[in-house]
Amino acid sequence: MAANNMVNPAVDPALEDELFAKEVEEVKKWWSDSRWRQTKRPFTAEQIVSKRGNLKIEYASNAQAKKLWKILEDRFAKRDASYTYGCLEPTMVTQMAKYLDTVYVSGWQSSSTASSSDEPGPDLADYPYTTVPNKVGHLFMAQLFHDRKQRQERLSVPKDQREKLANIDYLRPIVADADTGHGGLTAVMKLTKLFIEKGAAGIHIEDQAPGTKKCGHMAGKVLVPIQEHINRLVAIRAQADIMGSDLLCIARTDAEAATLITTTIDPRDHAFILGCTNPDLEPLADLMMKAEAEGKTGAQLQAIEDDWLAKADLKRFDEAVLDVIAKGKFSNAKDLAAKYQAAVKGKQISNREARAIARQLLGQEIFFDWESPRTREGYYRLKGGCDCSINRAISYAPYCDAIWMESKLPDYAQAEEFAKGVHAVWPEQKLAYNLSPSFNWKTAMGRDDQETYIRRLAKLGYCWQFITLAGLHTTALISDQFAKAYSKIGMRAYGELVQEPEIDNGVDVVKHQKWSGATYVDELQKMVTGGVSSTAAMGKGVTEDQFH
């Protein structure tokens, strides 16, 4: 029988180690760049290289990430901002490229308009986790195509005539929504891998629990512990390092409006967890189970819970201590309160340590029970806010490139408080801001303030700002306006609302055949057929000649 010549030849271990050591040094050199001056990696270059395969793949994501980082570095240094909005589809991405230097891909928009299951829904991140990466790929492929199309057109014209032609940078870096990572750490890594493969320059990930994730402007948000979210950020960086990408990682916190947290395991969260300060109440979960056993339902159960919460007098532990001081018979109450606050404020100490400080100062135990108010699902109650968000952002900073605090309102004072709180510890930390369409901008501020809001935020270090759903809303607006007018005045509506404004404003899509790449494809065909084609799409008879 002939020998099997298909068996892989033996690898020389010495050469294998030599190549490994060389690649490790390359990674260490990469990490020594100023790009990573604030980045903390709890893993080694050896660990990263050992997770790579033998075939080195250069991802477009890396070039786009470097471009995005350069933009944000420049904006942050100048206290300026790159601002953009959520893009729906290729037409939109080509028009955005003329005026904006980044592109955003929203999970909310994808959930409602582009789920890979084709089933639309609200922003609960319950769509397949390929959904947003697929939208990134959709847009990035369009960017690449229109870049090729434009280059071909420019190079087909003599050099002295090219200044008359458009020279648009279609390759605007894309930042995309990774929600909560869609699962555990390996899910986060696989999601990151998809984003890099599809061409994303950056992604953001929030500190909500995956199973209960909500849009940032919905109620019922449940946070994960600080360390759990740090683990997600580390997972993103590790996966990007394995793939050799400078992918930007933006840490989002929903702590400003969150009311629940999964566990008390992380002491850095303890100061913001609510406890019952009424020792006469039985645990809420026990009370609710009894009520259900008695046959109570719906509104009756809600009334029982509301009554219990009203009696529980829920407080953060620090609030409970200060309340005891204020209501007690302490001759030096003001001094005690100041000493307690000085001992705990901003220290990220555990509840056990805070109790010991209070006991030493007051000579008594503080009744505070964070177990009894737990929800039926087992979640602990939390009092979020800007201070809670700052606390989390300070912990996330070494593991991400920018930080975003989701907020209820476009509140400049709150944005300033957050920025100052973060920059007091991490002065170089880049910040991001959601200019959300969930805000009622008319009631929030006057038109003059609306016009300057981005610039004012930029002065605080918010170097990347975005309207998450502007693509959705602008599409809805023109669709409603056109459909309404078309139903009444027919083709006059198309002429007045669409075609004439397209021509007047020089919108390239008015020549939609050319915009779609018909000329470019004709040139491909001619290249293959020796320069002649009787079936050229843009040949004699094309109706687009009417627009010359």
From Swiss-Prot:
Cited function: Catalyzes the formation of succinate and glyoxylate from isocitrate, a key step of the glyoxylate cycle, which operates as an anaplerotic route for replenishing the tricarboxylic acid cycle. Required for growth on ethanol or acetate, but dispensable when fermentable carbon sources are available. Also acts on 2-methylisocitrate.
Residues annotated as the enzyme's active site: C215
Name of the protein in its database record: Isocitrate lyase
Keyword tags: Glyoxylate bypass, Glyoxysome, Lyase, Magnesium, Metal-binding, Peroxisome, Tricarboxylic acid cycle
Subunit details: Homotetramer.
GO CC list: glyoxysome
Residues noted as binding substrate in the record, renumbered to the chain: S106, G107, W108, G216, H217, R252, N434, L435, S436, P437, S438, T468
Keyword Lyase in record: yes
Binding site for Mg(2+): D177
Superkingdom, taxonomy of origin: Eukaryota
First-listed, main subcellular location of the protein, grouped into a coarse class: other
